[in-house]
């Protein structure tokens, strides 16, 4: 026990000897949750994850004997937690629409009964170590929750519970730890959020995370286990892009962390996700989704904890052998929380008031992504996608610039594209992906070997069109040759028929990889056939007037993912239309 000495917003000072950094504490008569972040002699600096209004010096501070941690076990999926893993559904039942300060509710429902199936390969007397699977629980109809020996524990298995129904607190196994010590294991365990969960070794990424968004999958792919950033100014569509990724990505588990964003955006997520169907299983999307909601009107330092809570939950499912994608919206709000705490601590600010350790904290967070061989021998991955909200869209500000140096995939959102109603507003000029060589091998093996060449040609066409657009803006389209005008038309086809994608269109919202490549190939075929006719002397006006061009723009929404073969038949119609135009001019003597 200790005594509170000073209250400075979310930061308090207490006389609390012999309590290490990182330890979780309870503050005052309300029992507010806090964490020790520094020491000065016998005094501890504590950041408080709840509002400190009415808290006064002299109140008691209780050290809980463990760091800020989360409870890991069956029952996580489908839940909505706040920034310190309190379930919002049960908080609503306990305290109403406003979360009462100091309310204590465990992250997992303790009374719920789970059907446990022991691992048939284990028996009493066998040596087990951290990460070994003791058995499984059907958490949802599509996800099997594997019960693991917590990392750091090892010993001889004394007993393993038979198949049956158990609560989270029931003992399902006992380990002989040596020195006449035994350890009881239950369906759940706790893990400190700031400590990355261990693994055997890192593995190279081998397959892309397919999001169903054409500009991301086809032009700037991200590998499973990779790290990506989505920077963009206000109104550019960051939240919508991240929600689309969370909805449609081919990961096994999706964790959406709303960190300091507006409450109405998170309400939209909470309202829409339960009604969506997972395209990969046909079941409810919430059966593989976990939400951490920490809105802008919640205590600022809780934003900092919410990202660590989200990534720890992701690592837990990774250790079970699953591919996890974590969507963090947004890391800028997290960095602002660091700035506020650093300012109250009196630390020397650097760029734009951020603390000097901003870059190292960002790097440490993103380093928790990766594809790994787990302690249990399986392979799992955590893919981290963080939104960045640079003020005024300035990508040179500290959070964006440091993030750009860390990530391997950068999906830069453009205000100009958003203003032109081009969504997703991902800029093909400023975005990049370092994962293209590996992704190309996957596309060649599973879809088509010409993917990389087609992508490169489309990017070249878009770049050429950008240069020609500057000329058009200065002197008008009449200054361009027929070939140059056709380059502009080819780039427009790619933009409107491939890159633009409606999240509200039930057909176009998700695009399968097979359809993505056929659409890319279709646009390039139109361009190639037009170039051939131009070389034969056909006027560019004749090409621009072909009805198939308008139909090609609509293919993305006219053909479902199951109609790829029908879409391929349309390419034959295009060849016939261009061939017919060439023959007409030849017969008329115009060529």
Swiss-Prot record:
A molecular function (GO) term: ATP binding
Keywords recorded for this protein, A-Z: ATP synthesis, ATP-binding, Hydrogen ion transport, Ion transport, Nucleotide-binding, Translocase, Transport
Catalytic activity, EC: 7.1.2.2
Catalytic activity: ATP + H2O + 4 H(+)(in) = ADP + phosphate + 5 H(+)(out)
Binding site residues for ATP: 232-239
GO biological process: proton motive force-driven plasma membrane ATP synthesis
Gene3D superfamilies according to UniProt: 2.40.30.20, 2.40.50.100, Bovine Mitochondrial F1-atpase, Atp Synthase Beta Chain, Chain D, domain 3 (1.10.1140.10), P-loop containing nucleotide triphosphate hydrolases (3.40.50.300)
TM segment ranges: none
InterPro entries, per the entry: ATP-synt_VA_C (IPR055190), ATP-synth_a_Xtn (IPR031686), ATP_synth_asu-like_sf (IPR023366), ATPase_F1/V1/A1_a/bsu_N (IPR004100), ATPase_F1/V1/A1_a/bsu_nucl-bd (IPR000194), ATPase_F1/V1_b/a_C (IPR024034), P-loop_NTPase (IPR027417), V-ATPase_asu (IPR022878)
One protein family per Pfam: ATP-synt_ab
NCBIfam families registered for this protein in UniProt: PRK04192.1
The family this protein is said to belong to: Belongs to the ATPase alpha/beta chains family.
Function according to Swiss-Prot or TrEMBL: Produces ATP from ADP in the presence of a proton gradient across the membrane. The V-type alpha chain is a catalytic subunit.
UniProt-recorded name of the protein: V-type ATP synthase alpha chain
Source organism (scientific name): Nitrosococcus oceani (strain ATCC 19707 / BCRC 17464 / JCM 30415 / NCIMB 11848 / C-107)
